[in-house]
Structures are given as structure tokens and as C-alpha cells.
Swiss-Prot record:
Function description: Not essential for virus replication in transformed murine cells.
Gene3D superfamilies in alphabetical order: Cyclic phosphodiesterase (3.90.1140.10)
A cellular component term, taken from the record's GO annotations: host cell cytoplasm
InterPro entries: Coronavirus_NS2A, Cyclic_Pdiesterase, NS2A-like
Compartment list: Host cytoplasm
Main location: host cell
Full protein name: Non-structural protein 2a
Domain of life: Viruses
Keywords: Host cytoplasm
Recorded family membership: Belongs to the coronaviruses ns2a protein family.
């Protein structure tokens, strides 16, 4: 009998796509909120505009797996490039929300990766991508309102690296300056800021380097077997994928060899 799939129906975290850093979007978003104020409606305005990509039920010791899942998505972000469309202000329960189109494939893939890494992700009910504008004390009928914004979602757009981020946020986290205080916040543009200095790992590293790199990392980051560790480092180095960035960020020895382009053993 197949194992029953676990859902985050009692979530404690979510993967967040913050929006406060996009000035074009924020100009229209704040204008929409000001219309609610001018209409004299008693509501709580959303101070942290965002899109929840998926909900999670995880423990703190799984944060690294979430980080690696996000980094894995960023490795393939070109597959999700396009425009994110915000439109159709309407009531969803007690909240006035915008429909969001363009994150469907990203949602499906990050849920799959998170589950593969042992994290309980997504809910048994259908995911409805939306951006909350305001919350009311009770369900309310709102007269037709207009909103449309197209946000380019590209690693590089008009020669500028993206401002997009993917975050891990604990439900109930405090809010500062339009953003949640997150457990992890990963800039999508870092995918283009890292580049191995040589085509092959073996061009500048030797087997003697493995223990020095392992000593800079947390236990379990690298396989205990040197050959397996070498294979993993070589694979990610030559493809410029997430684990290369992780080791580059956390191993002084690894960064030094990359900078010097030569083993120092």
C-alpha cells in the first residue's frame, strides 16, 4: 500500500515572495488601499504585501533542507521566468485580495522538492495564489474595484539583476518596514553572482582539500567518504548549482582556493 501523503494542514511556516521592494507594484497597491480608506470602510490594511508560495509544517532543524530546496529552485529559475500578473480585486472570505497568475509551476516544483527533502509542504485544499490587500471583521460586499499590474520575473531584466527574493517565514512573525522577519531570505539574483573560476573542480582542487573543506562546514554537509564528497563537490562546481554556493559561502578554505585558483595543501 502506498504511503499516505502528509499535508501542512496545521502549518507553522510558509515560503514567501515579498513585494514591498517593487516600487511600481507598491505605488498601485497603496493607491488601492487608499481607496478603501476614502470609502470609509472599517478594515485592517495589509502592511506586508506578499504572495505565499506554499505552507509548511516543519521544525527548526529542517531549515537547511528548506534553504537547499529554495536554492535548487533558484538554479532552475529560468524555467519560471515571465510576468507575474496581479488583477481582479475581490473578496476571499473576510479579505480583499488580488488574483496572482504566474507562480503555478513554481509552486508545484518547490512543493515537490520540499517533500523530497523530507518536509511537509502544501495543504490538502487547493492552493489559491493571491495577494491580500485588507482584512475585514466579517465577510463584506465591496463594489467593483480596478487593479492591474504586470511584474517582470526575470533573473536579469533591462540589464538589472532581479529584486526578487524567496523567504522562509514563521507564521506569526513580526513585521518591519513592509517585510516579515524571516528565518531565511534568499536573493534570487545570487544565481548570477557566483561563477566557478575554472571549468573543472579538479583544475584547482585535490583530494587533500576535502578534509579542509569539510572542517569548515557543518557535520553532514559532505558525505563522510572522500570519494563521494569529491564527486558531490565536483558535480555542483562544474554546474554552478546550489551546493557550490553553499560551500563557497561557508568554507574559508574553499573560497581561498577559488580566489587563488590553486590548491594550498
Amino acid at each position: 500500500m502506498a504511503a499516505r501523503m502528509a499535508f501542512a494542514d496545521k502549518p507553522n511556516h510558509f515560503i514567501n515572495f515579498p513585494l514591498a521592494q517593487f516600487s511600481g507594484f507598491m505605488g498601485k497597491y497603496l493607491k488601492l488601499q487608499s481607496q478603501l480608506v476614502e470609502m470609509g470602510l472599517d478594515c485592517k490594511l495589509q502592511k506586508v504585501p506578499h504572495v505565499s508560495i506554499t505552507l509548511l509544517d516543519i521544525k527548526a532543524d529542517q531549515y537547511k533542507q528548506v534553504e537547499f530546496a529554495i536554492q535548487e529552485i533558484i538554479d532552475d529559475l529560468a524555467a519560471y521566468e515571465g510576468d507575474i500578473v496581479f488583477d481582479n480585486p475581490h473578496m476571499l472570505g473576510r479579505c480583499l485580495v488580488l488574483d496572482v497568475k504566474g507562480f503555478e509551476e513554481l509552486h508545484e516544483d518547490i512543493v515537490e522538492i520540499l517533500r523530497r527533502r523530507g518536509c511537509t509542504a502544501d495543504q490538502s485544499r487547493q492552493w489559491i495564489p493571491h495577494c491580500t490587500v485588507a482584512q475585514f471583521d466579517e465577510e463584506k460586499e465591496i463594489k467593483e474595484m480596478q487593479f492591474y499590474f504586470k511584474l517582470p520575473f526575470y533573473l536579469k531584466h533591462n540589464n538589472l539583476l532581479t529584486d526578487a527574493r524567496l523567504e522562509l517565514v514563521k507564521i506569526g512573525s513580526s513585521k518591519v518596514g513592509g517585510f516579515y522577519c524571516s528565518e531565511l531570505s534568499i536573493w534570487c539574483g545570487e544565481r548570477l553572482c557566483y561563477k566557478p573560476p575554472t571549468p573543472k573542480f579538479s583544475d584547482i582542487f585535490g583530494y587533500c582539500c576535502i578534509d579542509k573543506i569539510r572542517g569548515d562546514l557543518e557535520i553532514g554537509d559532505l558525505p563522510p567518504d572522500d570519494e563521494e564528497a569529491w564527486a558531490e563537490l565536483s558535480y555542483h562546481y562544474q554546474r554552478n548549482t546550489y551546493f557550490f554556493r553553499h560551500v563557497h559561502d561557508n568554507s574559508i578554505y574553499f573560497r581561498t582556493v577559488c580566489r587563488m585558483k590553486g590548491c594550498m595543501c
